[in-house]
Amino acid sequence: MRAIGLMSGTSMDGIDAALIETDGETVAWLGSALTIPYGAETRALLEGAMADARGVNARTDRPGRLVEAERRITTLHGAAVRALLDSLRLTPADIDVVGFHGQTVLHRPDAALTVQIGLGQALADDLRIPVVADLRAADVAAGGQGAPLVPVFHQALVRGLDLPQPVAVLNIGGVANVTVLEDGADPIACDTGPGNALLDDFMAARTGRPYDDDGASAARGQVDEAAVAEVLGHPFFAAPPPKSLDRNEFRAFVTERLHLAGASTDDGAATLTALSAASIAAVVPLLPKAPKSWIVAGGGARNSTLRAMLAERLGVPVVVAEQVGWSADALEAHAFGFLAVRSLKGLALTFPTTTGAPEPLTGGVLFQPTP
């Protein structure tokens, strides 16, 4: 089947749209992708919506700016699909399904609550293409973490690679997550801790720029290793997989312990980057076997300082997704196209070893265009 996957991650920097050909079990090819960046107004709206979501107690609650944000991102996701189709000279009739993640505004698996805004029916009607959305809800309702969702996709991709195993596929978005894969074993997965979110927010506040471009600021700074070690004392980092995080889970905890207010921009960036690397490395002792190969995707893959810190702490080769024929920027969008096809076929999206679900579970809600 030919699917388009859509992803707007916790970094809130834009929408990734990617074409994929798959039967939901194997990947025939990873097609073209594009990114539609969010403007400053949309990003501010999403940040406000995320703040308003803190008081949400049910998945359908839409207080404050959530209603406007949901409409806005649905419209923008439709525009992203059309832009991708136009770039490939395709029409909606050429696409079997769209996988629509939406925007996570609240993730509290401890309260059996995860909220992704986005109007699946409106998107299906706009595009005239079937849409699968709400991909996390069934897992959380069954007692799972609802994240990460992508391990089954990583498993399909890694089957075609000749790398020393176990292989870790690391996505560094706003939150970082890892999938650990070995032939004959169920995938193991979890969120590892802060990815880019805290660093991006720090850079935006200090410089007005949305991120530390290629880790240039961090490369000039000095890491406060004692402060990083103090943050790693949080119980989350000692908990075994599966486990997951909300984007803002550590904001107050980290800010207080890293003493960022008194740090220079470069030193703050260096320490936050080191925290991301150290929290990823901290998952290794919690695994049955240490990964022998690491493949890095997501926005963090574009940060050479973070990659260097990660390689130093892991002590094994770290390669970016492009080095194995994938796209670091589009990997999660490709994943949601893959997951949409699995959902259509009733195949499992989540597993006890990836989200803590009680059994392998399918998920997602299908929205057909209104006749």
Curated annotation (Swiss-Prot):
EC number assigned by the record: 2.7.1.170
Major enzyme class: transferase
Alphabetically ordered keywords of this record: ATP-binding, Carbohydrate metabolism, Kinase, Nucleotide-binding, Transferase
GO MF annotation: an example: phosphotransferase activity, alcohol group as acceptor
Binding residues for ATP: G9, T10, S11, M12, D13, G14, I15, D16
Pfam families tied to this protein: AnmK
NCBIfam families in UniProt: PRK09585.1-5
Functional note: Catalyzes the specific phosphorylation of 1,6-anhydro-N-acetylmuramic acid (anhMurNAc) with the simultaneous cleavage of the 1,6-anhydro ring, generating MurNAc-6-P. Is required for the utilization of anhMurNAc either imported from the medium or derived from its own cell wall murein, and thus plays a role in cell wall recycling.
Protein's name according to its UniProt entry: Anhydro-N-acetylmuramic acid kinase
Gene for this chain: anmK
